[in-house]
Amino acid sequence: PGAAENDAPAAACRKDDDDDGYGEDAPPAGVTSGTDCDDARNLVNIAASETCATAYDDDCDTDTNDLGALSCSNFYADRDADGFGHETDAECRCDAEGVYNESDNDDCDDGSAQTHPGAAESESATECRRDEDLDGYGDVSPPSGVSAGDDCDDDDAERNPGVNERCS
């Protein structure tokens, strides 16, 4: 009795091999079950904080590397799969996962794969522009928050500032 003083009731007979104050959750017969999911590691128990530095469940909640774990990094959502993360949609994670797979937050329009920094590479490698026809020139009338380009017809790749006009 009293071996696992952090589990209630403290007077119960529990096994605490790692001396962290929490009893083993699957003890031998005749011993009261505790809340320690890994009684071989003294830093693993229900009062511990999850950390990205380990590959196991630190806080006994059955999840490994929870959102917001210690030493996590912001990963930004890339819902349009253009390789650029949304500027305000982030989760602090241990690893990239699902749509939260970008470490940058440069995407000015995460609803269009043709709108991101460098989309109009013939005009700017860094400005956020929309290039719907993928001709390298940005739309002259883009949505709010997106820099205007020089393409007067962004639905036709044959009409842009880089194409020579022909007389018929």
Predicted segments, located by residue:
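Membrane-associated feature with strongest affinity for ZDHHC
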Residues: 1-168
